[in-house]
Amino acid sequence: MNTILAQQIASEGGVEAWMIAQQHKSLLRFLTCGSVDDGKSTLIGRLLHDTLQIYEDQLSSLHNDSKRHGTQGEKLDLALLVDGLQAEREQGITIDVAYRYFSTEKRKFIIADTPGHEQYTRNMATGASTCDLAILLIDARKGVLDQTRRHSFISTLLGIKHLVVAINKMDLVDYREETFARIREDYLTFAEQLPGDLDIRFVPLSALEGDNVAAQSANMRWYSGPTLLEVLETVDIQRAVDRQPMRFPVQYVNRPNLDFRGYAGTLASGSVKVGERIKMLPSGVESSVARIVTFDGDKEEACAGEAITLVLNDDIDISRGDLLLAANETLAPARHAAIDVVWMAEQPLAPGQSYDVKLAGKKTRARIEAICYQIDINNLTQRDVESLPLNGIGLVEMTFDEPLALDIYQQNPVTGGLIFIDRLSNVTVGAGMVRELDERGATPPVEYSAFELELNALVRRHFPHWDARDLLGDKHGAA
């Protein structure tokens, strides 16, 4: 067992008290990214090592693995703590997204170690989609590279506002201040083109030697700023979803018996209280909250990020994929949108193609109307293209088969983010972020008979797990 962990548990008065203390710590999700061999895995290994998060058996195994697979001579190869795939160890690179957890006295952390190779950019986008902060590693010998620009742009595109530029391998440039200053200036010049209001910080460090990672470096007395760990422990993460209006995508209709009907899911943004008036989209039918049910019992109020089940005072027709929001909020379902796309498939994305798209719990079909442009990551300029290739990033116009309740991604990632699914292979082939909504008129609805409408309502009410589509779409009334 980790000796430090055992001491922490003892100081808290036992396992239960320690677990309660952990629950009350704030959580920071961050990723490490950069060009190939900039030291991402080594940095994470150093953080785990210097915060005493490594168990004795792991340390013993690391000594053995460093002799067989290590790239640091007689020193411990801390990257092997993270590079778990056999292919990664043999090639000395990171391929998959590796997640690690650690904590300090001030905060809990979830780290996503993302690949640096361009052909694995899709993996990097996956890792960035749930993070609040990005650590961008730059090799002090090489400076700002194309992949650094690519990862910076993807991070900001996916809504990350806090960037920590870690200028690594300072030991290989004799810890020179002028090298740090030059790279800092180069990156700030590039960052002027990045979208959004960003919080950018710079830390000179050596992940291999431990300089300015968890402790101040004696080799860089000219640097008076915080260490990387101090930045991670103190950065103020203001989540946009906390300030956004209530959004509750229904993931599951919970009906264990005839006396209970609840709507389960994770509150995407805002808050909800018992007694609050809400409405359901796409129908627009209103009701009020009777109960907020959780694993730990009923609550009077729930906040963004909580997994809850809502029980309403009225028996209305709601199924998986519907969206609940405050009754006084206006959100018009849209069939047309401009989407920022990160393409992840070998077959290019082209106009005329159709894909299944999944947004929260909603799944429907969409058609690609046009490729507006592709972003040139080297200079962030827009290029006219006929299709979007693997790892390409661009703006796409799309039409959905049915109206969807969408938000702008930068305002609400849950109700503004979607994935593309190949209809034949069921493989995820792309990620999309809603940029703009187009309120063009929808196609005239099909006229259904009274019998068809009644049958559809009965199926949706009594067999919600069938995920039957509402034939009346956004004009549907109460059941």
Curated annotation (Swiss-Prot):
Alphabetical UniProt keywords: ATP-binding, GTP-binding, Nucleotide-binding, Nucleotidyltransferase, Transferase
Region (G5): 206-208
G4 as annotated region, ranges: 168-171
Region: G2, residue numbers: 92-96
Metabolic or biological pathway, per its Swiss-Prot or TrEMBL entry: Sulfur metabolism; hydrogen sulfide biosynthesis; sulfite from sulfate: step 1/3
GO molecular function: ATP binding; GTP binding; GTPase activity; sulfate adenylyltransferase (ATP) activity
Catalytic activity: sulfate + ATP + H(+) = adenosine 5'-phosphosulfate + diphosphate
PANTHER family hit by this protein: TRANSLATION FACTOR (PTHR23115)
Protein name: Sulfate adenylyltransferase subunit 1
